């Protein structure tokens, strides 16, 4: 059995850990609101961007001059998985859930005879994926030094993806990230970026015909690269909010668990101390009776 001194040290250590997890929870809570507002503000723009492009693409998708970012290169053999995760841990299943979804998609494609490559955004995703797919990771972008995620960060990633597509390194690109729903709910999401999946009009919706100046193909040639950056930017903002939500929830659970451990350890300490005092009293009384 541990001595009383060892028990006191253990209780003090648990209390110190509880202070750290509580502080991390408060920091995550303070940053979550801003991150959530940024993610929610980006959603309407990204969704409207997709809707506009889908409308224009409806007329251009079948034309010979349709941009390759829209129509693709006609092949479906090499898939690039753009996996966006966080730079830090201590956030529950936030990072692992995104990686798990990407890993499942990779194994599914490989079982079909497809070639899979990875483009990692975020240190945690890279560290997990390289255990199984080290030779298949063709690029890795870390944002540890970025204090606040900006559109320029998404543009840089989009330019790298487009350059590799134009170089013929892959045929299809799918984005993986975590969509923020609430503090306790973040949804791992997969979204195809290249070729762009055109959303069909809802059932019962009357299709509207537009005339564009300049031609649809020319408009799309300018819009599609920007849309790619917009969708990546949205994913980064959703990830940021999801990270702080997951971290806040994880640290709250850790703080509660630490409190429960302290309660149990204190109870054991008090019982042990009481037993030692009782034993000493019995020895004193027995000695007095012997005299």
Curated annotation (Swiss-Prot):
Domain of life: Bacteria
InterPro entries membership: ATP_synth_F1_ATPase_gsu (IPR035968), ATP_synth_F1_gsu (IPR000131), ATP_synth_F1_gsu_CS (IPR023632)
GO terms, molecular function: ATP binding; proton-transporting ATP synthase activity, rotational mechanism
Primary localization: membrane
GO CC annotation, single: proton-transporting ATP synthase complex
Entry-linked SUPFAM superfamilies: ATP synthase (F1-ATPase), gamma subunit
Subcellular locations according to the entry: Cell inner membrane
Keywords assigned by UniProt, alphabetized: ATP synthesis, Cell inner membrane, Cell membrane, CF(1), Hydrogen ion transport, Ion transport, Membrane, Transport
Record bears the keyword Nucleus: no
One GO process term, biological-process aspect: proton motive force-driven plasma membrane ATP synthesis
Quaternary structure and partners: F-type ATPases have 2 components, CF(1) - the catalytic core - and CF(0) - the membrane proton channel. CF(1) has five subunits: alpha(3), beta(3), gamma(1), delta(1), epsilon(1). CF(0) has three main subunits: a, b and c.
Alphabetized NCBIfam families for the sequence: ATPsyn_F1gamma, PRK05621.1-4
Function text: Produces ATP from ADP in the presence of a proton gradient across the membrane. The gamma chain is believed to be important in regulating ATPase activity and the flow of protons through the CF(0) complex.
Protein name: ATP synthase gamma chain
Lineage: Bacteria, Pseudomonadati, Pseudomonadota, Alphaproteobacteria, Hyphomicrobiales
Record gene name: atpG
């Amino acid at each position: 059995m541990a001595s009383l001194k060892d028990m006191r040290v253990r209780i003090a250590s648990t209390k110190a850990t509880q202070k750290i997890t509580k502080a991390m929870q408060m920091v995550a809570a303070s940053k979550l609101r801003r991150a959530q507002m940024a993610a929610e503000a980006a959603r309407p723009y990204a969704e409207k961007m997709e809707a506009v492009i889908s409308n224009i693409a409806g007329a251009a998708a079948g034309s010979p001059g349709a941009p390759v970012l829209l129509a693709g290169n006609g092949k479906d053999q090499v898939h690039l998985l753009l996996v966006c995760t966080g730079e830090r841990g201590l956030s529950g299943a936030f990072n692992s859930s995104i990686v798990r979804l990407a890993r499942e998609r990779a194994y599914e494609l490989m079982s079909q005879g497809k070639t899979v490559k990875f483009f990692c955004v975020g240190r945690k995703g890279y560290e997990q994926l390289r255990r199984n797919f080290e030779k298949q990771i063709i690029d890795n972008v870390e944002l540890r030094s970025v204090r606040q995620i900006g559109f320029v960060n998404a543009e840089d990633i989009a330019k790298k993806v487009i350059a590799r597509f134009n170089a013929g390194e892959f045929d299809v690109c799918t984005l993986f990230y975590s969509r923020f729903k609430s503090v306790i709910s973040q949804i791992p999401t997969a979204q195809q970026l290249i070729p762009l999946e055109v959303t069909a009009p809802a059932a019962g919706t009357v299709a509207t015909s537009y005339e564009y100046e300049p031609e649809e193909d020319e408009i799309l040639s300018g819009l599609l690269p920007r849309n790619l950056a917009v969708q990546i930017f949205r994913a980064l903002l959703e990830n940021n909010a999801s990270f702080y939500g997951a971290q806040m929830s994880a640290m709250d659970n850790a703080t509660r668990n630490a409190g429960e451990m302290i309660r149990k350890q204190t109870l054991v300490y008090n019982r042990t101390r009481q037993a030692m005092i009782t034993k000493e009293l019995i020895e004193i009384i027995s000695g007095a009776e012997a005299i």
